[in-house]
Curated annotation (Swiss-Prot):
UniProt-listed CDD domains: NAD_synthase
Lipoprotein is among the record's keywords: no
Gene that encodes the chain: nadE
EC number of the protein: 6.3.1.5
Function noted in UniProt: Catalyzes the ATP-dependent amidation of deamido-NAD to form NAD. Uses ammonia as a nitrogen source.
Protein's UniProt name: NH(3)-dependent NAD(+) synthetase
UniProt: deamido-NAD(+) binding residues: 140, 173, 180, 260-261
UniProt source species: Streptococcus equi subsp. zooepidemicus (strain H70)
Length: 274
């Protein structure tokens, strides 16, 4: 088995999908998790206005609505959370996403004061924090807020990680990578786009240039620029196609470097890192 084949197997990627079937699978998955854990009543998800949170949010709202209809339990709720750092430049996109999702509840938690307070505390301790590191602090603060909301509402936190991000390790460890359930896991970026099209989302939600937008000095930095490889190449690789040797080497290098992100804290019995 080649490394490419092994990665495809580990991430559960299909070369060809039926978007409607994948939508149903994700919705049923989200429903089944709550039914298996009757003490859980809500799903919580941060909404940025990009493709991934728009899709995950819509799937979550669909699952919750079906659960309410099937069980008669009105405690089932989906809570969408806006988590800007100060003023978000693309706030209009986030509002479009909320209009598409139509969440049961929408909260806004501005993380700027918490992030800046943490930076001041670190600087007082004698540490100068880089802009890149600050970006990771933002990502982790967003998860602190989501877990606080989930803790108060008997909820579970949804993550937006999908196969194209996972293979590249393109998420913050214990930040956006720290979630309870991943309804998009197995899908490539283009497959996620296909699901949004099937759900009749506004094209602006899936045609927008993907960006983590964490760094103050590089606002709106495109994912593909940060990664040095295009999503088309990543998706082709994950769907089993042949790509350039250079792109394949870069993807596989990111895969190896990001292995620690795909594991719980390393124990003495782990050997994947050796």
């Amino acid at each position: 088995m080649t490394l490419q084949e092994d990665i495809i197997r580990q991430l559960g990627v299909k070369a060809v999908i039926d978007p409607k079937q994948e939508i149903r699978q994700s919705v049923d998955f989200l429903k089944a998790y709550l039914l298996k854990h009757p003490f859980l009543k809500t799903y919580v998800l941060g909404i940025s206005g990009g493709q991934d949170s728009s899709l995950a949010g819509k799937l979550a709202q669909m699952a919750i609505e079906e659960l309410r209809a099937e069980t008669g339990d009105e405690q089932y709720q989906f809570i969408a959370v806006r988590l800007p750092y100060g003023v978000q430049a693309d706030e209009a996109d986030a509002q479009k996403a909320l209009a598409f999702i139509q969440p049961d509840q929408a909260l806004t938690v501005n993380i700027k004061e918490a992030v800046d307070g943490q930076l001041r505390a670190l600087e007082t301790a004698g540490l100068e924090i880089s802009d890149f590191n600050k970006g990771n602090i933002k990502a982790r603060q967003r998860m602190i807020s989501q877990y606080a909301i989930a803790g108060q509402t008997a909820g579970a936190v949804i993550g937006t990680d999908h196969a194209a991000e996972n293979v590249m390790g393109f998420f913050t460890k214990f930040g956006d990578g720290g979630a309870d359930i991943l309804p998009l896991f197995r899908l490539t970026k283009r497959q996620g786009k296909a699901l949004l099209k099937a759900l009749k989302a506004d094209p602006s939600l899936y045609e927008k240039v993907p960006t983590a937008d964490l760094e103050d000095k590089k606002p709106g930095l495109a994912d593909e620029v940060a990664l040095g490889v295009s999503y088309q190449e990543i998706d082709d690789y994950l769907e089993g196609h042949t790509i350039s040797a250079e792109a394949q080497a870069r993807i596989e290098d990111w895969w190896h470097k990001g292995q620690h992100k795909r594991h719980l804290p390393i124990t003495i019995f782990d050997d994947f890192w050796k």
